[in-house]
């Protein structure tokens, strides 16, 4: 994939990319960046969740978004809800993929009505995958939930029974159970 090749060529394939904090942030904006740094520190030290190589399914979903909107040219975010249902004979998964063409798509594209239908049929809301492709300075995205993401997934857990959270930059993914997320700060 061109995205991965370009990142590798730049030498930017880092498991723990530095958070690009804007200089001169003050007031509430400075508080947000302080909380973002706090969360990244917990994740990078392994206190909350784990960061490892992207999984096969997550790479496929990231590639789907990259095929829709080239992530090097125009970074965009997506959210994929992964549900599962198992029996003694087999385990099944369903993916509800929501994205737009803009950097921050509206939550209306995330397909939560479909997720709700599956949950009502006995499927478990196994995990949500979200992406952070590139930072504003062009560096590889942070594979850690932002303070806004933390607040959002807490709501999904409370309302829909979400079990886990993953955040990927196309190379590495953060993975944590909802209970672990209590230590992270939210916006």
Labelled PLM ranges:
Residues 1-121:
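Glycine-rich short-loop/terminal segments
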Residues 1-31, 109-187:
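Active-site-proximal loop/helix of nucleotide/amide-processing enzymes and allied scaffolds
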């Amino acid at each position: 994939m061109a995205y991965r090749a370009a990142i590798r060529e730049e030498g930017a394939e880092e498991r723990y990319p530095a958070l690009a904090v804007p200089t001169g942030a003050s007031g509430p904006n400075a508080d947000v960046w302080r909380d973002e740094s706090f969360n990244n520190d917990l994740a990078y030290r392994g206190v909350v969740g784990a960061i490892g190589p992207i999984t096969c399914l997550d790479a496929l979903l990231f590639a789907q978004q990259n095929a829709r909107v080239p992530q090097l040219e125009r970074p965009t975010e997506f959210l994929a809800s992964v549900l599962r249902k198992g029996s003694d004979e087999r385990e099944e998964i369903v993916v509800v993929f929501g994205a737009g063409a803009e950097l921050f798509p509206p939550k209306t594209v995330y397909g939560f009505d479909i997720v709700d239908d599956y949950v009502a049929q006995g499927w478990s809301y196994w995990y949500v995958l979200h992406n952070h492709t590139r930072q504003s300075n062009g560096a590889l995205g942070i594979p850690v939930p932002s303070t806004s993401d933390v607040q959002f997934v807490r709501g999904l857990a409370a309302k829909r029974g979400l079990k886990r959270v993953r955040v990927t930059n196309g190379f590495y993914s953060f993975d944590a159970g909802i209970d672990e997320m209590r230590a992270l700060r939210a916006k």
